[in-house]
Amino acid sequence: MYRVLAKHDRPAPGGTGPSWWSFIGHTTDSLWSVDLFRCESIVLRTYWVLVVMDQFTRRLVGVGVHCGAITGVDVCRMFNAAIHGQGTQRHLSTDHDPLFEAHRWKANLRILEIDEIKTVPYVPLSHPFVERLIGTMRREFLDQVLFWNARDLERKLAEFQVYYNAARSHASLDGHTPLTFAGGHTMAPANLNHVRWVSHCRDLVQLPTAA
């Protein structure tokens, strides 16, 4: 069926209507996206990172960390740690990773009363925002720092989360940060005659700001 649709079912280009993804995630915290990626410590131990982001504001909601092989139980623990203190949302988008098909994962979502929305099979571009966030975390942060263990990784990712949500502007948000976009704040014109530099992520990132 997939091969037949991929070959013959080609939608006409130039559609102007919103996608179902945009329709569901049109307000803050109405749709969160979740995905996993892997990284290595300074002693070459493998760590898995679960990322939760808000679709509408691009806000990094939280992360969960696990060392070594991962199971459905571990994914539940990581997800619960990532959203701790954040409340819950109605919808959650995940891909077709077998870890997101595990019985414990499904049961955890039922307990939290969260509706799971699956991406299109074999189409990575159907999960673009969280994939881009993971790429940003790798390029701008994890590729530039070293970490020793899970606690060290969690601490450094928490610093990146503060920077990403409060200081890093996004072109798709018209230059806003996720926090200012969520709050509906207007961007005042900057006085470029008085500029100071603010460091983030332990001086890894330096951003100019109006003094």
Language model regions located:
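Charged DNA-binding/catalytic regions of mobile-element recombinases
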Residues: M1-A211
